[in-house]
Amino acid sequence: MKNNDSKISKYISLILRHKPEEIGLKLDEHGYLGVLDLIEGLNKSYEGFSMDDLERIVREDSKGRYSFNEDKSKIRANQGHSIKVDLGLEPIKPPKVLYHGTGRKYLESILKNGLIKKERNYVHLSKDIETASIVGKRHGDLVILEVDSESMFNDGIKFYLSKNNVWLCNYVPKKYIKELNLEEVF
């Protein structure tokens, strides 16, 4: 299965974040899916897919998208859901600034409306410019936004930190957002 890992990982992401019904399943309230159920569902498209394959995909995923429960009987995505799940995240004080990478085509709307979660449960923010830039490049002409997370936190906006170190919040009002000059950053 190794040569299909990237494709399978994207499919697992779709199932665990957005559409478990693709394989006839439903996530529990905390976003978990039974590992054996997932493997059985994946075998409909990827014959021979095994627990070893799943463990390798989780272990080698550079973004840390997935995690097992303690006994590895369940698996879930660490963040990025468009369906309602309770990840059990506790509010936490963020660093002074966080970053958001996006495409230039979205900048006007963001500067007018702030960062909104759209179909996801949270707005995703990065602790460093490099990570934000990797995310943003997927959306076309790169724009990096600096978010004054310290002021947001002091104004009562809650932040959460996912298991794979993605900062999450419900909304970033426009007054806390500043576009960075990429020539000065890189």
Swiss-Prot record:
Please describe what this protein does: Removes the 2'-phosphate from RNA via an intermediate in which the phosphate is ADP-ribosylated by NAD followed by a presumed transesterification to release the RNA and generate ADP-ribose 1''-2''-cyclic phosphate (APPR>P). May function as an ADP-ribosylase.
* Keywords noted in UniProt: NAD, Transferase
Sequence intervals crossing the membrane? none
Protein name as it appears in the record: Probable RNA 2'-phosphotransferase
Task: Mention one GO molecular function.
Answer: NAD+ poly-ADP-ribosyltransferase activity
Question: Please, one GO biological process term?
Answer: tRNA splicing, via endonucleolytic cleavage and ligation
Organism classification: Bacteria, Bacillati, Bacillota, Clostridia, Eubacteriales
What domain of life does the UniProt record list for this protein's source? Bacteria
Q: What class of enzyme is it?
A: transferase
The family assignment reads: Belongs to the KptA/TPT1 family.
Disulfide cysteine pairs (residue numbers): none
Q: What is its EC number?
A: 2.7.1.-
Does the keyword Iron belong to this entry?
no
Report the InterPro entries cross-referenced here: Ptrans_KptA/Tpt1 (IPR002745), RNA_2'-PTrans_C (IPR042081), RNA_2'-PTrans_KptA (IPR022928), RNA_2'-PTrans_N (IPR042080)
Q: Does the keyword Transferase apply?
A: yes
